[in-house]
Amino acid sequence: MSGSSNQFTPGKLVPGAINFAEGEIVMNEGREAKVISIKNTGDRPIQVGSHFHLFETNSALVFFDEKGNEDKERKVAYGRRFDIPSGTAIRFEPGDKKEVSVIDLVGTREVWGVNGLVNGKLKK
């Protein structure tokens, strides 16, 4: 091909290139995180995504507060999600009990759909 160049020129933009800024990305900076435990009492694996309202997860998941007490009303999960990178998930195999970090949902603090337990603004 005459007139075309496949050579890279430093300082020029390259289509499809990803340029990263210096430093680290701090996830959920300034947000208060709590560590709770969750156990899968079911007979199938359960995977929960990063922004899923934990209060409305599969009923086979049992929640424990920061002191290790079972929370049958799921108060520790109400209005919260996992403190993990967007687009990731945590998987609970049958019988698994894991300590997880959770943070409050932010923005308009509305939850619609899911299991239909809130369908509107969160109360706290």
UniProtKB/Swiss-Prot annotation:
Gene Ontology MF: a single term: urease activity
Cellular-component GO terms for this entry: urease complex
HAMAP family: Urease_beta
Recorded metabolic or biological pathway in which this protein acts: Nitrogen metabolism; urea degradation; CO(2) and NH(3) from urea (urease route): step 1/1
Enzyme class: hydrolase
Subcellular locations according to the entry: Cytoplasm
Name listed for the protein in its UniProt record: Urease subunit beta
SUPFAM superfamilies, per the entry: Urease, beta-subunit (SSF51278)
Keywords, ordered alphabetically: Cytoplasm, Hydrolase
Pfam assignment, any one: Urease_beta
Gene3D superfamilies in UniProt: Urease, beta subunit
EC number of this enzyme: 3.5.1.5
UniProt family annotation: Belongs to the urease beta subunit family.
Reactions mediated catalytically: urea + 2 H2O + H(+) = hydrogencarbonate + 2 NH4(+)
GO biological process: urea catabolic process
Species: Ureaplasma urealyticum (Ureaplasma urealyticum biotype 2)
InterPro entries the UniProt entry points to: Urease_beta-like, Urease_betasu_sf, Urease_subunit
Gene: ureB
Quaternary structure and interacting proteins, as annotated: Heterotrimer of UreA (gamma), UreB (beta) and UreC (alpha) subunits. Three heterotrimers associate to form the active enzyme.
Keyword S-adenosyl-L-methionine: no
